[in-house]
């Protein structure tokens, strides 16, 4: 199982770094920060599907 540590999120501003992650909602997030903010917003219902684009 692939996991990402989102314990230090949410962050108010994310960098523009592009290291895509695919969420369980079938959305490609541009980087860990954007993904983790979405995880927090979803109360943990979104999980990491895999690294890279969906």
From Swiss-Prot:
Chief localization: secreted
Glycosylated residues, chain numbering: 43
Keyword Disulfide bond recorded: yes
Site entry (Reactive bond 3), positions: 16-17
Keyword Repeat attached: yes
PROSITE patterns (alphabetical): KAZAL_1 (PS00282), KAZAL_2 (PS51465)
Coiled coil: none
Compartment(s) of residence: Secreted
Keywords: Disulfide bond, Glycoprotein, Protease inhibitor, Repeat, Secreted, Serine protease inhibitor
Any one GO molecular-function label of the UniProt entry: serine-type endopeptidase inhibitor activity
GO cellular component: extracellular region
InterPro entries, per the entry: Bifunctional_prot_inhibitor, Kazal_dom, Kazal_dom_sf, Prot_inh_Kazal-m
Domains: entry comment: Avian ovomucoid consists of three homologous, tandem Kazal family inhibitory domains.
Protein name as it appears in the record: Ovomucoid
Lineage, broadest ranks: Eukaryota, Metazoa, Chordata, Craniata, Vertebrata
């Amino acid at each position: 199982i692939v996991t990402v540590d989102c314990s230090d999120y949410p962050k108010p501003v994310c960098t523009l770094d592009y290291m895509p992650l695919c969420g369980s909602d079938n959305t490609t997030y541009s980087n860990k920060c954007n993904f983790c903010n979405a995880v927090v917003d979803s109360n943990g219902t979104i999980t990491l599907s895999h690294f890279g684009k969906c």
